[in-house]
Curated annotation (Swiss-Prot):
GO terms for cellular component: mitochondrial inner membrane; respiratory chain complex III. Component of the ubiquinol-cytochrome c reductase complex (complex III or cytochrome b-c1 complex) that is part of the mitochondrial respiratory chain. The b-c1 complex mediates electron transfer from ubiquinol to cytochrome c. Contributes to the generation of a proton gradient across the mitochondrial membrane that is then used for ATP synthesis. The keyword Lyase does not apply. A ubiquinone binds at residue 201. One of its GO terms (biological process) is mitochondrial electron transport, ubiquinol to cytochrome c. This is Cytochrome b. Binds 2 heme b groups non-covalently. One of its GO terms (molecular function) is ubiquinol-cytochrome-c reductase activity. Its main location: mitochondrion. It comes from Planigale tenuirostris (Narrow-nosed planigale). Heme b b566 binds at residues 97, 196.
């Protein structure tokens, strides 16, 4: 009798995706982040669903309803802490996943990569509207500052901003629609994840060497299910340590005060995972220029496949490109630090230099390094 998982129409899909899937035998722990992101998404949807059962999206009661969840709902404090810190874990895994893609040349699977960039943008949009929901000071002013950037668009900007707000400023209508967006977007993300996997399974996974792995494949189960389970243990351990021992360390103290349109916080800043883009936005003194730089900082990922000049796919055997990659990583950490600092010297100039270096590395230096490495590998006799 044939195994049910190989004959049943639904089980067959699961089997081909997670059990009998041929996977390269040499993929490292850097390939764990895809499954970890899937787990993060499930955690966020489940905790978010329970939070939505007790939350009210009204300017008068939103802040109180979050306090009520933490004080009166059974394990409400835990659900909220898991949801808030789960977002940080989600972005940590996302950044590492994208970094892995750049380092090992996974971006050459263009369809998978492009869907991935769309996923990144959608997750960022979801996190932004979600941060507004507790209706604390930083929620309100963060929403005001970021939505106000739309007004920099020539001719239609102000109309567009007011259309998003549902009035002449961030208010009740804005909060209600942001809650609606925050509820629906994770399901759109889930659909995009399925498309992402669909494209990935058309080509199969890349591997650290960047060489075609077809001659040496192993079944996904049990080898990589066990490996992913280990990654999951580390993820859950980190998330629980964060949520149980230091739940507010990544948040902003201003968000413990209810939103007050008459009192501006001294330093308006987003959550840590947006700080690198916020630093790039602030490094340009012109409003429209800043908005364009902000968009470019993420959308630049779409042009990376077209800037691949090296004869080798992976950076595994390309020391110059490796050096530039780690400079880029350090540069992003610098931008994250600058994004959280006040707008004064020396932070302004450091932010501007780091922003220039960010674009210079991706658009100029890394493609040149690829060409130089090709030249170095050519026989000279």
């Amino acid at each position: 009798m044939t195994n049910l998982r190989k004959t049943h129409p639904l089980m067959k899909i699961v089997n081909h995706s997670f059990i009998d899937l041929p996977a390269p035998s040499n993929i490292s722990a850097w390939w764990n982040f895809g499954s970890l992101l899937g787990i993060c998404l499930v955690i966020q949807i489940l905790t978010g669903l329970f939070l939505a059962m007790h939350y009210t999206s009204d300017t008068l009661t939103a802040f109180s309803s979050v306090a009520h969840i933490c004080r009166d709902v059974n394990y409400g404090w835990l659900i909220r802490n898991l949801h808030a810190n789960g977002a940080s874990m989600f972005f940590m895994c996302l950044f590492l996943h994208v970094g892995r893609g750049i380092y090992y040349g996974s971006y050459l699977y263009k369809e998978t990569w492009n869907i991935g960039v769309i996923l990144l943008l959608t997750v960022m949009a979801t996190a932004f509207v979600g941060y507004v929901l507790p209706w604390g000071q930083m929620s309100f002013w963060g929403a005001t500052v970021i939505t106000n950037l739309l007004s920099a668009i020539p001719y239609v900007g102000t109309t567009l901003a007011e259309w998003i707000w549902g009035g002449f400023a961030v208010d009740k209508a804005t909060l209600t629609r942001f809650f609606a967006f925050h509820f629906i977007l994770p399901f759109i993300i889930t659909a995009l994840v399925i498309v992402h996997l669909l494209f990935l399974h058309e080509t199969g996974s890349n591997n650290p060497s960047g060489i075609n792995p077809d001659s040496d494949k192993i079944p996904f189960h049990p080898y990589y299910t066990i490996k992913d389970a280990l990654g999951l243990m580390f993820l859950l351990l980190t998330l629980l340590l964060l949520a149980l021992f230091s739940p507010d360390s990544l948040g902003d103290p201003d968000n413990f005060s209810p939103a007050n349109p008459l009192n501006t916080p001294p330093h308006i800043k987003p959550e840590w995972y947006f700080l690198f883009a916020y630093a790039i936005l602030r490094s340009i003194p012109n409003k429209l220029g800043g908005v364009l730089a902000l968009l470019a900082s993420i959308l630049i990922l779409l042009v990376i496949p077209f800037l691949h000049t090296a004869n080798q796919r992976s950076m595994m055997f390309r020391p110059i490109s490796q050096t530039l990659f780690w400079i880029l990583s350090a540069n992003l950490i610098t931008l994250t630090w600058i994004g959280g600092q006040p707008v004064e010297q020396p932070f302004i100039i450091i932010g501007q230099l780091a922003s220039i270096l960010y674009f210079l590395l991706i658009l100029v230096l890394m493609p040149l390094a690829g060409l130089f490495e090709n030249y170095m590998l050519k026989p000279k006799w």
